[in-house]
C-alpha cells in the first residue's frame, strides 16, 4: 500500500527520498552474551519553507515529504496542498526544502508562539492549542463493535518496523475495517502528520475525514485529539469525537461520545 498517488495535476512535486528504517547494533543480554539486533534509525530532518528555517523533526524517515506536508497542515500554516510547489528531501544534509507558490501569509506571526505538548517528549505546536476548536463540526459517523475488533485485528496482522525493531509508534486510518494507510515513526505526532499529508494527496472521498477511523498506539494525548479532529477527553466531548482507548483483543474503554459506537454485547 504505497502512500504516494500520482494524479498528474498541480499537486506538490515530491522528491520521494529514501533511507533505511532500521540499523543493526550489538547488544549484551542478561547472560552476558552478545546479540546482533535491529533498532529504529532515528534521524533529524530540518524543514525550510521558502529558504526560511522552520523546525527540526526527529523522524524514522519512512515518508519524509508526506510528514512535512502534514506537519504544515496540522500546524495550520497551510490550508491546501496546492499552495505548495515542491517538497525536496536530502538525507545527505538532513534537510527538507519546501517551495510554495506565493509564500505563507504572516508566517512570522503564526510561528512566533510555540506550545510544548506531551507528544513523546518533542511534541510542540505553533499558536493557540484551542484556536478555532469551537468552529470544528464533525459528521455523524459511527462504528460497530465488530468494526472495532476488525480494525484491531488488522493492526495485529500488519507488518511493521515495531515487530522487527521495536521503539516506534504506529498510526492508521480506516474506512470501516479497511485500512487505508499505516504509518510508523519514532513519535505518534509524526505518524499522524504523515497521514494528514497522505490524505491531502488522495481523491476527494479519501480526503474526507468525517467518515474515517483514526488509530494510534500509545496514549490519547491532547495533541493527538487536536490533530485527529482539528484536547484531552474534555475537548473530545465538546466536539462529539468518539475516543476509544486501552483497546486490545476484545477489551476497550470508550472515553467520549459513546453514542457513536453501536454496542454488540453478543460478540
Predicted region positions:
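Glycine- and Gly-Pro-enriched alpha-helical subdomains that act as flexible
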Residues: 161-218, 230
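Generic structural signal for well-ordered alpha-helical scaffold segments
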Residues: 156, 196-200, 225
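Cysteine/selenocysteine-centered motifs that mediate thiol-based redox chemistry or coordinate metal-sulfur cofactors
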Residues: 89-103, 208-238
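Solvent-exposed alpha-helices and their adjacent loops that cap or buttress functional pockets
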Residues: 37-40, 89-90, 161-166, 174, ...
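Extended, folded domain segments that form the structural surfaces/walls around functional sites
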Residues: 141, 152, 189-193, 225-235
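Short, solvent-exposed amphipathic alpha-helical segments in soluble enzyme
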Residues: 62-63, 72-73, 188-189, 197-200, ...
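Conserved catalytic-core subdomain
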Residues: 220, 224-267
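Intrinsically disordered, low-complexity regions enriched in acidic/Ser/Thr/Pro/Gln residues
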Residues: 2-170, 174-175, 181-182
